[in-house]
């Protein structure tokens, strides 16, 4: 029995019969495209190249293989052209839907200024040069207008993808490039829409009056589409979104109505046969003025983008390769190469000149604005389509059109390298120092910023200073920082003219309650500084006077400026007379959380139950029992580094308690699937770092009869971890733990955070600070410096402009 699939698409001439080799070859072409595409993109991923580059390379090769070209000749080429046109309609619709036309009605922002300036300089330069190079013999000035507009535009989807892939979209330059690219793309495509109305690509009508009425008809249809879409679509889509809330399946009838509505607004300007309005540009206009917020719009964007990226774009570039036909490429055509280098130079020079001039007015660095200009030269699929269409309609020679497409693709090829150069320069200009105890150079002084909410923190602050110093060489600097909320009453008492001991020397605080509080704290910490004078201890006073909204930012800025290794903050809850903790201060809790998230160094939160009331560690004969719990992970390693500072003090009796997971237990075996889901390489690297760090500590402070004692506990699950923590109840005055609560793969803490009251303390710290734990044991929860972002040596939101 013959397996024959018959589909009549073009009269009686196209029948897809898989029994015939030339028919099966069509299927083989598409399979080859998708397979080779995946492999080639994987190989080019280290270069940061987007799919457009690999798709073009594959399409150019496969589209020029004679057997493949023969399989798609004749009526099949018509079908392929129809597929490409439909795909471009979808591409332009979703591109418009992702844009926001309301920015055109607002005062121009920096990105708009850069977009306008770079567009104008490139357009003027291109329009001055292109008419003399004779790209086409039909309507040369109209073609020069279109080519100049293409040269001045930007392919925002490709540019945004390159910026996101190389992880600079949160930086100031990344944000500016993305916004300016979208603005440029939107303006240039709208100008294409207007240009098509007055200069249609179809054969012009003989009489000027007829041409005028056709242009008037298309303009009226354009205005009707914009008006109808802007007014009706928000009402309709808001109703659909309200009827289909998040979390519930989309109703089929509403989905069908929404798609029908989209098809209606995209197509109705093309209904009158006299209009000849371009359906691709009509789809862009419809998408542009549709609301892009809401569930239905997001659903449409996601689905269409998925189909475009996985199915359409590979076929599109096969069509482009088919159109180019390298056999017709005349490499000896000198004039074509003059056009090539002239247009490439015009695109680069125009964009770079415009952005540099605008950047100078805005106060940006020239190298960065030049890089921004190079990024804005990036073109996209729409520009490739226009160039290929010019070849197909014989408006340009095949060689000239192919070289224009090569220029478009070349602007995409070098964009990732421009971004890499930006990152390289940012690393030099914006170095990020690793400020953590674990990597502290032993030959440098220890710098610690200690926050105080009031006089009740004096005792714990002095004890922290003492145990951290421990006779350390070359010494320690402690920045005792008062964290004071800036209320309206306090703001009314501020006077210009700095006061001594304040971090902000532009004002003096005259509020009586604040000055009395600061005087009592200053007397205590200065007294300790005088006591340790000559022993390498330096105490300095700081003030963070801010609202709770900005206090975390000020403290982090102070820590960065002072280059401290760790910030130690008081817990937001205070000790009651009965030994319990009160409900806490919501403002200081907010500050602690923000500092944990944004601090440039390590952070410790001190839960003071009795630490500030115990015998001062510097008194003769004083003794203080301190324990550190080590499970594993970066925070536990930082806690161990803090314990190493504490271990030097003669009055401290330090005990290291290491919780080890029993690998032979059934629980550990069940968790192997979790390890498989997580990055096994990362987990093994973490375990290696833990073992190396602990071995170094053990050899230095525990082995050979050191003063630090050691205990291991082999546990199987979080329940046994909780029991082990309860067994420490009341034995130590201070317990040091890492906020992370061990490695992500550790089963010893899994489940402990299900009922967390204070997530900022981590699973172990939250248990130890609970109301059912000892009222005599204080906790210090430590978090190692978080290097935000995925760029090595840089934060995601680095600033370089």
Swiss-Prot record:
GO cellular component, one term: membrane
Tissue specificity: Specifically expressed in pollen.
Database matches in InterPro entries: Cation/H_exchanger_TM, CPA2_transporter, Na+/solute_symporter_sf
Keywords on record: Antiport, Ion transport, Membrane, Potassium, Potassium transport, Transmembrane, Transmembrane helix, Transport
Gene Ontology biological process: potassium ion transport; proton transmembrane transport
TM segment ranges: 24-44, 77-97, 113-133, 140-160, 179-199, 216-236, 252-272, 275-292, 304-324, 343-363, 371-391, 403-423
Predominant place of localization: membrane
Subcellular location per the Swiss-Prot or TrEMBL entry: Membrane
UniProt KW Membrane keyword: yes
Domain of life: Eukaryota
Pfam families per the UniProt record, alphabetical: CHX17_2nd (PF23256), CHX17_C (PF23259), Na_H_Exchanger (PF00999)
Membrane topology: Multi-pass membrane protein
GO MF terms held by the record: antiporter activity
UniProt record similarity statement: Belongs to the monovalent cation:proton antiporter 2 (CPA2) transporter (TC 2.A.37) family. CHX (TC 2.A.37.4) subfamily.
Annotated function: May operate as a cation/H(+) antiporter.
Protein name: Cation/H(+) antiporter 28
């Amino acid at each position: 029995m013959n397996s024959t699939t018959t589909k009549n698409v073009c009269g009686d001439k196209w029948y897809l019969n898989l029994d015939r080799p030339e028919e099966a070859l069509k299927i083989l072409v598409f399979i080859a495209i998708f397979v080779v595409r995946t492999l080639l993109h994987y190989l080019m991923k280290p270069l940061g190249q987007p799919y457009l580059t690999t798709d073009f390379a594959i399409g150019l090769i496969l589209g020029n293989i004679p057997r493949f070209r023969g399989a798609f000749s004749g009526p099949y080429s018509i079908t392929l052209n129809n597929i490409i046109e439909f795909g471009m309609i979808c591409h332009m619709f979703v591109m418009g839907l992702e844009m926001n036309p309301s920015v055109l009605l607002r005062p121009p922002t920096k990105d708009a200024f850069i977009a306008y300036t770079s567009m104008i300089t490139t357009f003027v330069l291109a329009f001055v040069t292109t008419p003399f190079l004779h790209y086409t013999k039909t309507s040369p000035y109209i073609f020069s207008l279109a080519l100049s507009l293409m040269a001045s535009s930007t392919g925002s989807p490709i540019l945004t993808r390159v910026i996101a892939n190389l992880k600079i979209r949160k930086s100031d330059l990344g944000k500016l490039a993305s916004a300016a690219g979208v603005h440029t793309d939107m303006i240039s495509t709208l100008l294409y829409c207007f240009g098509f109305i007055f200069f249609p690509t179809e054969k012009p009508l003989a009489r000027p009056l007829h041409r005028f009425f056709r242009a008037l008809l298309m303009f009226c249809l354009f205005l009707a589409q914009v008006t109808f879409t802007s007014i009706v679509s928000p009402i309709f889509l808001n109703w659909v979104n309200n009827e289909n809330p998040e979390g519930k399946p989309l109703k089929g009838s509403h989905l069908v109505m929404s798609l029908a509505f989209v098809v209606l607004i995209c197509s109705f300007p093309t209904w009158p046969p006299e209009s000849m309005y371009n359906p691709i540009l009509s789809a862009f206009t419809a998408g542009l003025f549709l609301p892009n917020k809401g569930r239905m719009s997001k659903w449409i964007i996601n689905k269409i983008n998925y189909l475009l990226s996985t199915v359409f774009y590979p076929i599109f570039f096969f069509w482009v390769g088919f159109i180019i036909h390298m056999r017709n490429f005349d490499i000896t055509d000198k004039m074509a190469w003059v056009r090539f280098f002239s247009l490439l130079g015009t695109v680069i020079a125009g964009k770079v000149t415009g952005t540099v001039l605008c950047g100078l007015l805005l106060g940006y660095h020239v190298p960065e604005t030049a890089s921004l200009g190079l990024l804005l030269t990036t073109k996209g699929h729409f520009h490739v389509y226009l160039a290929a269409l010019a070849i197909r309609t014989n408006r340009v020679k095949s060689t000239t059109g192919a070289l224009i497409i090569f220029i478009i693709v070349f602007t995409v090829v070098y964009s990732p390298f421009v971004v890499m150069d930006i990152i390289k320069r940012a690393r030099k200009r914006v170095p990020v120092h690793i400020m953590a105890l674990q990597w502290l150079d032993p030959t440098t002084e220890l710098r610690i910023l200690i926050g105080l909410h009031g006089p009740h923190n004096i005792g714990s602050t002095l004890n922290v200073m003492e145990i951290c110093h421990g006779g350390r060489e070359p010494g320690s600097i402690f920045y005792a920082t008062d964290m004071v909320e800036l209320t309206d009453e306090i703001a009314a008492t501020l006077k210009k003219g700095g006061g001594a001991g304040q971090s902000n020397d532009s004002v003096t605080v005259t509020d009586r309650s604040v000055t009395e509080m600061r005087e009592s704290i200053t007397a205590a910490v200065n007294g300790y500084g005088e006591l340790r004078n000559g022993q390498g201890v330096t105490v300095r006073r700081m003030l963070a006077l801010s609202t709770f909204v900005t206090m975390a930012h000020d403290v982090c800025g102070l820590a960065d400026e002072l280059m401290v290794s760790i910030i130690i903050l008081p817990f937001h809850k205070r000790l009651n007379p009965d030994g319990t903790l009160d409900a806490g201060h919501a403002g200081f809790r907010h500050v602690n959380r923000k500092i944990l998230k944004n601090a440039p160094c390590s952070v410790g939160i001190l839960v003071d139950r009795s630490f500030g009331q115990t015998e001062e560690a510097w008194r003769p004969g004083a003794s203080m029992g301190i324990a550190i719990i080590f499970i594993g992970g970066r925070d536990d390693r930082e806690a161990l580094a803090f314990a190493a500072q504490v271990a030097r003090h003669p009055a401290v009796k330090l005990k290291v308690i290491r919780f080890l997971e029993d690998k032979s237990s059934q629980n550990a075996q069940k968790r192997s699937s979790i390890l498989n889901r997580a990055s096994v390489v990362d987990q093994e690297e973490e375990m290696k770092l833990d073992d190396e760090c602990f071995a170094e500590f053990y050899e230095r402070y525990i082995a050979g009869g050191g003063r630090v004692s050691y205990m291991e506990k082999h546990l199987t699950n979080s329940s046994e971890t909780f029991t082990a923590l309860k067994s420490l109840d009341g034995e130590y005055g201070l317990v040091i733990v890492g906020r992370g609560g061990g490695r992500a793969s550790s089963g010893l803490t899994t489940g402990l955070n299900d009922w967390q009251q204070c997530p900022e303390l981590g699973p172990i710290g939250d248990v130890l600070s609970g109301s059912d734990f000892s009222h005599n044991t204080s906790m210090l929860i430590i978090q190692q410096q978080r290097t935000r972002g995925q760029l090595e040596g840089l934060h995601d939101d680095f600033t370089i402009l």
